[in-house]
UniProtKB/Swiss-Prot annotation:
Name under which the protein is recorded: Solute carrier organic anion transporter family member 1A3
Gene Ontology biological process: bile acid and bile salt transport; monoatomic anion transmembrane transport; sodium-independent organic anion transport
Biased segments, Basic and acidic residues type: 283-292
Protein function: Mediates the Na(+)-independent transport of organic anions such as methotrexate, taurocholate, folate and prostaglandin E2. May contribute to renal secretion and/or reabsorption of hydrophobic anionic compounds. Mediates renal clearance of methotrexate from the blood.
Main location: membrane
Source species: Rattus norvegicus (Rat)
Disulphide bonds in the chain: C439-C469, C445-C465, C454-C486
Segments in the Cytoplasmic topological domain: 1-20, 81-86, 185-203, 268-311, 378-381, 537-545, 624-670
Limits of the Kazal-like domain: 433-488
Molecular-function annotations in GO: bile acid transmembrane transporter activity; organic anion transmembrane transporter activity; sodium-independent organic anion transmembrane transporter activity
């Protein structure tokens, strides 16, 4: 019975004692972590509107994930090598799930979302205070004492999102450094690029599901089930619309916890891929005995930490890699974190539509590119020198084509008092006193309220009152306003709720932009895999996990944390009109100067990426002049293969020779 149980246990362990099974589990972890991260990025505008906070704070929330990573990355990368790496990864996935759950809590702890409006949900002529009426002062619906602003439940609820994102970052910490080093240690060197390509593909599959989930959640009203959506006076294209962001985070929490389970069944070490089973046993025994040596002394692990830390930090080969990646990640963090906001404001689309289009055009192209790049590196056994040169050329080509984005633009929606005068003349700046004109001074309108209507003349107005409208017909989003004194048109001088559409020409430009973006995504993914392999080969095998950790540390300190914060502050400077909360305090931005937004958004990304190619060129030179620690030249490879063949033939002879009666003699011979 004991032998049967031992055999069953061995068989069970054997199912998980394979590098490809671990690769599959790690790919799922990459999918889950990128699913959560992409969904978070896609919901930034929803969080901004839900809590009425500026973009700078939203950028801080986005960067808080990197803060969580930063707290543990180096220690996990080093001490994780001494511990059971798969189990540490499993715990990390579970912690990510906890973080996602905490992010969703504010929805259950605060009241319903009340957007800024003076319009009642039903057309009641006795209560049409939102229309142009002489000798009557408008108020937001409902009104509160401004002193109550700080007491609003939602005023600090965004801190839950901040803390949850930090915890999510802590949980994500061990996945990349420990997972990649685990694969690098036990995979064939020629298979490593393909495996890394599969991981990177998993990292792109996650965003596909994340964007689809984000698109679905953004199309559902945040308080669905507790409000009658027919009474809403806003649509998904309205900048005040908030989608059901909390649903997606609950889904992400469940996925992360489920993905964590398989990692608790993997062994601490795996057989080296490509070696015979008997040789594997010998090598693994050596590895295990080596790993157990430091445990003879309690302080053995911590004693060597700081001396060990110096090696990758002071390694000359990595000096050019760090600034290159920091500049690149700054640019990409800015570009992808604020891409939904840019497309919404530039092309006048809803969050749900923008997120869906991003997933359709960009991510499949990146996935295909990752797989092809990994396969080509394995197929042609591309050297480190060639990989560095190839990555440099492809990345530079993608960067050059990216300047076409500056040409595919749309103008601001014309809004009287903001971008245009009431006579339709364009104005360079927004001045608060310009929102009033001779046609609406008698109406006693609120000048800060954002209840936009689109007139028959193609000009939008900040509210029906500011358009001089005196009558309304219909309910909800079907409400129509008549007798509008500020609307000069040959027709009925009427207006409908919402901003004016940007027209089919702008929609066509969005299609051109997305096609260009898909093409650039393919070039980017072709360059990413060889570039990442150059980085891995710059690190000694025994320092790989710590080297990856230090690299991630540098990226988080100088790119992941500051980029969304400083760029969010720059975006706030392009705001033309800030929203107003119930109590009168400023809320989220309602309209941006899209021309300034475009120059900052595209210009900052281009400047950061352009400056990154100087250290990239240095990397190409270094790989040609110096022998990298992770590189194996052809002669060494031939000698290793000859030794392996000789050992395998000895192993075969030993099995055929009857004079070896036990395993001890067999191991002695080997």
């Amino acid at each position: 019975m004991g032998d049967l149980e031992k055999g069953a246990a061995t068989h069970g362990a054997g199912c998980f004692a394979k590098i490809k099974v671990f690769l599959m589990a790690l790919t799922c972890a990459y999918v889950s972590k990128s699913l959560s991260g992409t969904f978070m990025s896609s919901m930034l505008t929803q969080i901004e509107r839900q809590f009425g906070i500026p973009t700078a704070i939203v950028g801080f929330i986005n960067g808080s994930f990197e803060i969580g990573n930063l707290l543990l990355i180096i220690f996990v990368s080093y001490f994780g090598m001494k511990l059971h790496r798969p189990i540490v990864i499993g715990v990390g996935c579970a912690v990510m799930g906890l973080g996602c759950f905490i992010i969703s809590l504010p929805h259950f702890l605060m009241g319903r979302y009340e957007y800024e409006t003076t319009i009642l949900p039903t057309s009641n002529l006795s209560s049409n205070s939102f229309l142009c009426m002489e000798n009557q002062t408008q108020t937001l619906n409902p009104a509160q004492d401004p002193a109550e602003c700080v007491k609003e439940v939602k005023s600090l609820m965004w801190i839950y999102v901040l803390v949850g994102n930090i915890i999510r970052g802590i949980g994500e910490t061990p996945i990349m450094p420990l997972g990649v080093s685990y694969i690098e240690n036990f995979a064939k060197s020629e298979n490593s690029p393909l495996y890394i390509g599969i991981l990177e593909t998993g990292k792109m599959i996650g965003p596909i599901f994340g964007l689809l989930l984000g698109s679905f959640c953004a199309s559902i009203y945040v308080d669905t089930g507790s409000v009658n959506t027919d009474d809403l006076t806003i649509t998904p294209t309205d900048i005040r619309w908030v989608g059901a962001w909390w649903i997606g985070f609950l889904v992400c929490a469940g996925v992360n916890i489920l993905i964590s389970i398989p990692f608790f069944f993997f062994p601490k070490t795996l057989p080296k891929e490509g070696l015979q089973e008997n040789v594997d046993g010998t090598e693994n025994a050596k590895e295990e005995s080596t790993e157990k040596r430091p445990r003879k002394k309690n302080r053995g692990i911590t004693k060597d930490f700081f001396p060990f830390l110096k090696s990758p930090v002071l390694q000359p080969d990595l000096h050019a890699v760090h600034p290159y990646k920091v500049l690149q990640v700054n640019a990409f963090n800015i570009y992808f974190s604020f891409l939904p906001k840019y497309l919404e404001n530039q092309y006048g689309k809803s969050t749900a539509e923008v997120i869906f289009l991003m997933g359709v055009y960009n991510l499949p192209a990146i996935c295909i590119g990752y797989l092809i790049a990994g396969f080509m590196m394995k197929k042609f056994k591309i050297t480190v020198k060639t990989a560095a040169f190839l990555a440099f050329c492809l990345s530079l080509s993608e960067y050059s084509f990216g300047f076409c984005n500056f040409l595919i633009t749309c103008d601001n929606v014309p809004v009287a008092g903001l971008t245009n005068s009431y006579e339709r003349d364009q104005k360079p700046l927004y001045l608060e006193n310009n929102v009033l004109a001779d046609c609406n001074t008698r109406c006693s309108c609120l000048t800060k309220t954002w209840d936009p209507v689109c007139g028959d003349n193609g000009l939008a107005y900040m509210s029906a009152c500011l358009a001089g409208c005196e009558k309304s017909v219909g309910t909800g989003t079907n409400m129509v306003f008549h007798n509008c004194s500020c609307i000069q048109s040959p027709g009925n001088s009427s207006a409908v709720l919402g901003l004016c559409n940007k027209g089919p020409e702008c929609t066509n430009k969005l299609q051109y932009l997305l096609i260009l973006s898909g093409f650039l995504s393919i070039l980017y993914s072709f360059a990413a895999i060889p570039g990442y392999m150059v980085f891995l080969r710059c690190i000694k095998s025994e320092e790989k996990s710590l080297g990856i950790g230090i690299h991630a540390f540098c990226i988080r300190v100088f790119a992941g944390i500051p980029a969304p914060i400083y760029f969010g502050a720059l975006i706030d400077r392009t705001c033309l009109h800030w929203g107003t909360q119930k109590c009168g305090a400023p809320g989220a931005c309602r309209m941006y100067d899209i021309n300034s937004f475009r120059r900052i958004y595209l210009g900052m990304s281009a400047a950061l990426r352009g400056s990154s190619y100087l250290p990239a060129f240095v990397i190409v030179i270094l790989t040609r002049k110096f022998s990298l620690p992770g590189k194996i030249n052809s002669s060494e490879m031939e000698i290793a293969e000859m030794k392996l063949t000789e050992k395998e033939s000895q192993c075969t002879d030993v099995h055929r020779n009857p004079k070896f009666k036990n395993d001890g003699e067999l191991k002695t011979k080997l």
